[in-house]
């Protein structure tokens, strides 16, 4: 793609959509992956009537809208709504004509082939893009860290994956997933805050809980000792001012919330913690590459942003693996945008030109071309 018409990169997340132009350092648009439709025809009289509200606008009007999230646990579930998100992305956020730009989209690991073909079909037939590519989010996150081999722990809003990548290719047989991710953590934070006397029940208040989670929570290196210390002193207590001016104190919820990533049983789940997922994924890989994977553990996604997470993960992995093995955790500062940044790098490479699925190839081969060319 030329500098005048750089490729557009869209990272489709369960919680947030990130979009921008290949070659840029960061996405230009970041907005919630949510579509709202008026509950009743008469509710929004006096305002400019719209059939749908998308992203932040939908959340701002959530009281009179029925919200739908087209991506659940990493998979597109509502294609009509997803089209509307992409339309909003092109015309409202980026103000770009789809027909002028190739598009590189991200997908979750093990995305069904039919889903990939559907994305390809929509991009060529609805948006008339000149060229298309789709790549696994974790692979792009690894690229953004300057690596082509490693294991990515990608934990976003809807799903967590451990994805081994060897020389640029993901190894699907070893990919593991957990539904313990951002939304689950926010739910768990809400439970912990309620136990402390704070009540959050509406969807608007859920957003407040999410903000508390993101601003105040941290991962304890030694959970039991921090739990004991929090009962003896106020060292772990922080205050948070609610929108109405009321100030609440937040204590154990600060470290109990992200502890769920390591101990899902705290919320009655029998899923593995992220350290166990990482270990099991590497054990599924060829013995000859395991040491290299342990030396290149890359964190990615918004739910990996907790302070203390890299240190705790290293400690837990060292307890699981044979003595003498080395573990190295990479936690880039911009890791909540890692997949998008990797797509930006890939989409701007001259050597990538031959990888795009062109509109001519689509016309000749149909949507199945996406599964042959997008590896």
From Swiss-Prot:
SUPFAM superfamilies: Actin-like ATPase domain. It is an enzyme of class 3 (hydrolase). It catalyses: ATP + H2O = ADP + phosphate + H(+). Pfam families: Actin. It is found in: Cytoplasm, Cytoskeleton. Disulfide bonds: none annotated. One of its GO terms (molecular function) is ATP binding. GO terms for cellular component: cytoplasm; cytoskeleton. Keywords: ATP-binding, Cytoplasm, Cytoskeleton, Hydrolase, Nucleotide-binding. Its EC number is 3.6.4.-. Its main location: cytoplasm. It comes from the Eukaryota. InterPro entries: Actin, Actin/actin-like_CS, Actin_CS, ATPase_NBD. Actins are highly conserved proteins that are involved in various types of cell motility and are ubiquitously expressed in all eukaryotic cells. Belongs to the actin family. This is Actin. It comes from Giardia intestinalis (Giardia lamblia).
């Amino acid at each position: 793609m030329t500098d005048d018409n750089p490729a557009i990169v869209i990272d489709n997340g369960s919680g947030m959509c990130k979009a921008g132009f290949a070659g840029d350092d960061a996405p230009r648009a970041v907005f919630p992956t949510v579509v709202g439709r008026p509950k009743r025809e008469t509710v929004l009289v006096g305002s400019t009537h719209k059939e749908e509200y998308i992203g932040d606008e939908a959340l701002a009007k959530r009281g009179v809208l029925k919200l739908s999230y087209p991506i659940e646990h990493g998979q597109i579930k509502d294609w009509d709504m997803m089209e509307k998100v992409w339309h909003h992305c092109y015309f409202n956020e980026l103000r770009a004509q789809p027909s002028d730009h190739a598009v590189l989209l991200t997908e979750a690991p093990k995305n069904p082939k039919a889903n990939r073909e559907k994305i390809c079909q929509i991009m060529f037939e609805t948006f008339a893009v000149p060229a298309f590519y789709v790549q696994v989010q974790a692979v792009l996150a690894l690229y953004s860290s300057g690596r082509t081999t490693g294991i990515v722990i990608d934990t976003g809003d809807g799903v967590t994956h451990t994805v081994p990548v060897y020389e640029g290719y993901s190894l699907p047989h070893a990919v593991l997933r957990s539904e313990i991710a951002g939304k689950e953590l926010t739910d768990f934070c809400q439970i912990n805050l309620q136990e402390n006397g704070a009540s959050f029940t509406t969807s608007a208040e859920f957003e407040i809980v999410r903000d508390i989670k993101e601003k105040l929570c941290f991962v304890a290196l030694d959970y039991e000792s921090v739990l004991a210390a929090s009962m003896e002193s106020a060292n772990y207590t922080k205050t948070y001012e609610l929108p109405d001016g009321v100030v609440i104190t937040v204590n154990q919820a600060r470290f109990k919330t992200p502890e769920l990533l390591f101990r899902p049983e705290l919320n009655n789940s029998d899923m593995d913690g992220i350290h166990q997922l990482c270990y099991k994924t590497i054990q599924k890989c060829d013995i000859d590459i395991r040491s290299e994977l342990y030396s290149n553990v890359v964190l990615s996604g918004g739910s990996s942003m907790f302070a203390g997470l890299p240190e705790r993960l290293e400690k837990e992995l060292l307890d699981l693996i044979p003595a003498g093995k080395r573990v190295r955790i990479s936690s880039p500062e911009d890791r909540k945008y890692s997949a998008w940044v990797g797509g930006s790098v890939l989409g701007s490479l001259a050597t990538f030109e031959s990888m795009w699925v062109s509109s001519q190839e689509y016309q000749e081969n149909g949507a199945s071309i996406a599964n042959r060319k997008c590896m």
